[in-house]
Amino acid sequence: MESIEQRVKKIVAEQLGVNEAEIKNESSFLDDLGADSLDMVELVMALEDEFETEIPDEEAEKITTVQQAIDYINSHGKQ
C-alpha cells in the first residue's frame, strides 16, 4: 500500500502536470512547481477526495509546500 507521502506526490504530479520524480517534500506549489491559484483549488479538492477529508479555506491557504500537505493529511485525513 502506498504511503500518504507517495499518494500526495502522485496527486500533485497529476494535478500540476509535473514529473513525480521532480517533486520534493520542500517543493513550493507556487514557486517550484508552477501552480497558480486555480491549480491550488483543484489540488485541494483532489486531496479532499483522495483522503476523505474537508480542508477549510483558511487551512488550505496555509498549505504551500508538499510537506505541509502531507502533514495536514497525516493530522486530519483518513489513512
UniProtKB/Swiss-Prot annotation:
What's a Pfam family this protein contains?
PP-binding
Q: What is its main location?
A: cytoplasm
Q: Which SUPFAM superfamilies match?
A: ACP-like (SSF47336)
User: Matching PROSITE patterns, A to Z?
Assistant: CARRIER, PHOSPHOPANTETHEINE
Key word Isomerase present = no
Q: In this chain, where does the modification O-(pantetheine 4'-phosphoryl)serine occur?
A: S37
Give the subcellular location: Cytoplasm
Gene Ontology process terms (BP): lipid A biosynthetic process
Carrier domain sequence ranges? 2-77
Q: In which pathway does it act?
A: Lipid metabolism; fatty acid biosynthesis
The alphabetical list of record keywords is:
Cytoplasm, Fatty acid biosynthesis, Fatty acid metabolism, Lipid biosynthesis, Lipid metabolism, Phosphopantetheine, Phosphoprotein
Q: Name one GO molecular function term.
A: acyl binding
Membrane-spanning intervals of the chain: none
Modification note = 4'-phosphopantetheine is transferred from CoA to a specific serine of apo-ACP by AcpS. This modification is essential for activity because fatty acids are bound in thioester linkage to the sulfhydryl of the prosthetic group.
Cellular component, GO annotation: cytosol; membrane
Entry annotated with the keyword Cytoplasm: yes
Output the InterPro entries linked to this UniProt entry: ACP, ACP-like_sf, PP-bd_ACP, Ppantetheine_attach_site
What is the annotated role of this protein in its UniProt record? Answer: Carrier of the growing fatty acid chain in fatty acid biosynthesis.
Which family, according to UniProt?
A: Belongs to the acyl carrier protein (ACP) family.
The protein's name is Acyl carrier protein
- Originating organism: Bordetella avium (strain 197N)
